[in-house]
Amino acid sequence: MKNKNIGFVSTRFAGIDGVSLEANKWAEIYKQHGHNCFWFAGKLDRDPERSFLVPEAHFQHPKNQWINEQVFGKKGRTHTVTELIHALRTLLKIKLQQFIDRFNIDLLIVENALTIPLHIPLGLSLAETIAESEIPTIAHHHDFYWERDRFAVNAVNDYLRMAFPPKLPNIKHVVIHSEAQEQLALRTGISSIIIPNVLDFENPPLMNTKSADTFRKSIDLKPDDKVILQPTRIIRRKGIEQAIALVKELRDPRYKLVISHETGDEGHEYAEWLNDYALDHGVDLRMVKTQIADPWNGNGKYHSQYTLWNIYPHADFITYPSIYEGFGNAFIEAVYFKKPLLINRYPTFARDIEPRGFDLVVMDGFLSKRTVYKVKEILESPKLREKMVNTNYEVASRYYSYGVLRNQLSAMMNEFFHGPEQYLSHTPLDSPNIIYLETKKEPPPTHQKAL
């Protein structure tokens, strides 16, 4: 197959939110196969020569924030709001076409911008651009609007039905868990494939000890301090108060609770409440203030800053008490770094992940005495901890490795462009023993770009 130019589109590709992390993993796989990747968003930390920055595309742009304030939590919208939505849609549509033309894009990958309506004008502009240009598109869905209470009451149902997501013949839809697949089909009639979040389990992480030690000093950790790591953004659905409760019950001043990520898109009130809650319960809480970079981002812009790879080595235990997750990046990262963890039985975990056979400390919405006892047992027993983390790494290697992603992306590219490789093997998707058949069929002409 001839190398393709692939354009990633979202409101933001920056930092270590789940969408940005997964997009970089996809891009890494594509680049390994000789394809070129380019980036369109309202906030970017990618290679500037391969980026198309449009500030109006960011979900936190003032005009978009004003629109969201007018249409969510309300049942009617004014003509003024509609006019602004379409003005932004028109601008972004022009910018999208410029992006496609400048980098000669063959395939669009839309990361969550046709899924959750944080930026309605961007979703509308994407739907129209994809329909008019007929450009091959993968819509990668992380969390749908019907999964979030904040979007339940709205004044934009017409736009949601049109673009979140659109039903077009040149779009292949990808979801990250089975419930999303079923709900998407039930609500819209759209079929999809499941590609879970993955990590490179074929290659264990390489850690920079010097940078890791510098990070430890930067948050004033003493040599004998023990780190309970909460590797998530600070938003309500992460259930971080349960991590505070756990550290309190450990009753050992050496244990420090460290939150590695920044606040999310829901404001700072929850972070302020957590600080007060930890203080009231006598828990030493450290929120990392330094910007944490994405370890898969090869731009090098953050060479003087820390990545997740500098943080995980210091963790003695991981807390992941989320109420809801699309998949669970922190879970798979903890397994990758061979760290024991406490996880809440959120729906996707209970349905898609738990049956795989991981060895974890699991809570069911509340922190019981038995759960605290099991955490203490693991912290105090190196032998038990080693057995647990090795089991988890082996299980994850079978189900959540790059091999799974590599084969799925290759199959979709083949369907779009009718390249010379055809799958014949019935071996599991993560098997390296994929057999290909070379064909001499000429590929059809590429899509026609809109003028």
Regions found by a protein language model. Name each.
Residues 380-421, 436:
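A charged, aromatic-enriched C-terminal amphipathic alpha-helix characteristic of glycosyltransferases
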Residues 323:
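Aromatic "clamp/platform" in nucleotide-sugar-dependent glycosyltransferases that forms part
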Residues 2-3, 29-31, 36-107, 292-293:
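A conserved catalytic-core segment of Leloir-type glycosyltransferases
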Residues 216-217, 221-238, 244-247, 257-259:
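Conserved donor-binding/catalytic core segment of Leloir-type glycosyltransferases
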